[in-house]
């Protein structure tokens, strides 16, 4: 109330921002007559002039009015499009490192060219980030003529691109690509063996298209490059026979003979006592568990992992909802966009369990080699901005996590779409029948209809019902993504009915009357007559659709995010066009079933509604919106929590990657190696000669043996002490270090500077990468169990920081020890051996392909692409010796029962 009163007096923050930017727009418009008078050559020559002025110290802010005026004039001449004033405001917003919320169809792609052009003048590169390869390619090719006219180069990055092409794309003034590809290139750049292999030239400025999808929906998605671990395919296949014999328990706290309880919110399962006993018996019969042995003993934790994955695969992940089968592979379906994600795989053995369930070939599990999150990757950019049709509902999160303000850009023409109230039915069948009936009614007006569904399953049920009703229609879901552009291009034609799974991120406008240019492109060698005919047909169809009320949007289910619902609605009413939208819901919808209050559901059931009857009530609509707010708040908390923990990992990641860059950049690493020798010697000697100890406590024999075994060097420590009794601890350390270094220098001289430097670089990078990989696994295990510290009255976050720091320090010590040991024990290599070593490094670098993991916290779903780099067992967590009963207190000291703590699945 108070906020709205103050806003009414002083104007909202958004209104004040728009008022300030309109003054800059006035400056741009004032330059238009002068810029329009320039010849093409003079207009193109403005770019080198701006670059020179920038290099002499003029800021981009100062150049903005003139640069925007030049870009607008160039777009007018090259593309036949002139930026509206609202697009200029959007361009200013992007340049200032903010998020521009612009309605669908208002020209976000054209708006982005302004900020791209201005920021490319710095010569440091601009990255334009999209949600898929199709949009990156489309936008780059659409804008290429404009930027090339202005003297700027364009690059496109994509997966499986040759190293040369990718390097050239990153050297371009403006580079287009997907968020995944940019993120993976960053990780890959920090796994190379020479600076020349790096592709990215720094993270200067990024414009993220569909910014809410990338920074919100995929924020808790770690990017992971991984390698194969041990093969457990036979075990997955064997355990797959167990879940069909089990029954879920209906409620968590009410024992009803069920074997496990399902938590749909967390997408996790917890075994009951009966479940444990049943599974144990099954495993004993299979010969996987010895008679009298317990499933929850420390040695059988691997079996627990497999059983859990199998139950989740059978009861929580369903075909044509969470995944599809294509060419004998399980392909994940993105829950936010409805797109398939080829190559991505769920983690924690879930993907293998689904493959076993579907009787497909089971691929091996993976181990993490390098990882970051989108949250931390995008915060590395010096300046970040974004554009979307829907960001205002997540404005607080954008500000808190990324420091990005959201500016709502006014529409060029007033929005006249009618958003009608939701209709709620008793069950899904009644809802689907009502949708079919409504489609029949709308078809009488010849208006185009877009039906949005949340799952592939729902789209196919509706498609079946429409077919039975004799209604012609198109289906756009993960199974038809190859025809996506064609389907969307004609979705605005009269009489068209299109069923689409989650329109979020589709990135293509639906033009009322259809897209005559798309039809023309399909004609081989089109003539001018063809063009005129198609234009005339479109004008006739366009008028038909306008008179029918525009595009009609039917939502078959509310998404858990209001923003996704708004994106579906936003497909209608573009640029002042008419349109209608309405959502059809049922009590069986996941959002209603899981999150809506029992009181609302009970009240609706008590009303005695029939299957074909609907209610339309503000209280129910409010309840649905509150449910969505709860889910959004919960997901925000998860993302914030992920960031808290990943910030710890991120600081360590920065140190490791910085150290890697130093190793690659230095011509010689001799100083580093000598320093390492000294540190390692101090640590090694301290194991046998404790600091500030007396001679009687010294283990000289053990020290000499360690030097012989670890470093391959004979050091007569006892002889030195016999010869000089005054030799103290400090002097002894120095003398041993000098002896080891003398041997190192002699070998170095024998190899020659170039060969020695290459060998040192190889050992340092190899040790760093190997132990960093193991450290990531150890950090994963630490994170999975750190919440248990809360039961011991400790702060899990602080405990995580402390433990992570100790792990990191230990890792650095082990890396140094490894390098010194390897360099001490290796024989002087021949030129042929050095050449072979270099070839191996090249093969390893070329073998690195991206893999991608969704590994969401708290058991939420995730995906990982597996790529075999080398076979390595995953570091195991500390074992907890189980008590005699699962109801006994857990030995970890948490105060919980064992079954609710370390014995929990």
Swiss-Prot record:
It is a peripheral membrane protein. It catalyses: ATP + H2O + cellular proteinSide 1 = ADP + phosphate + cellular proteinSide 2. ATP binds at residues 87, 105-109, 509. May bind 1 zinc ion per subunit. The keyword Translocase applies. GO terms for cellular component: cell envelope Sec protein transport complex; cytosol; plasma membrane. It is an enzyme of class 7 (translocase). Its EC number is 7.4.2.8. Keywords: ATP-binding, Cell inner membrane, Cell membrane, Cytoplasm, Membrane, Metal-binding, Nucleotide-binding, Protein transport, Translocase, Translocation, Transport, Zinc. One of its GO terms (molecular function) is protein-exporting ATPase activity. Its cofactor is Zn(2+). The keyword Transmembrane helix does not apply. It comes from the Bacteria. Belongs to the SecA family. Part of the Sec protein translocase complex. Interacts with the SecYEG preprotein conducting channel. Has a central role in coupling the hydrolysis of ATP to the transfer of proteins into and across the cell membrane, serving both as a receptor for the preprotein-SecB complex and as an ATP-driven molecular motor driving the stepwise translocation of polypeptide chains across the membrane. Monomer and homodimer. Part of the essential Sec protein translocation apparatus which comprises SecA, SecYEG and auxiliary proteins SecDF-YajC and YidC. This is Protein translocase subunit SecA. The lineage of its organism: Bacteria, Pseudomonadati, Pseudomonadota, Gammaproteobacteria, Moraxellales. The gene is secA.
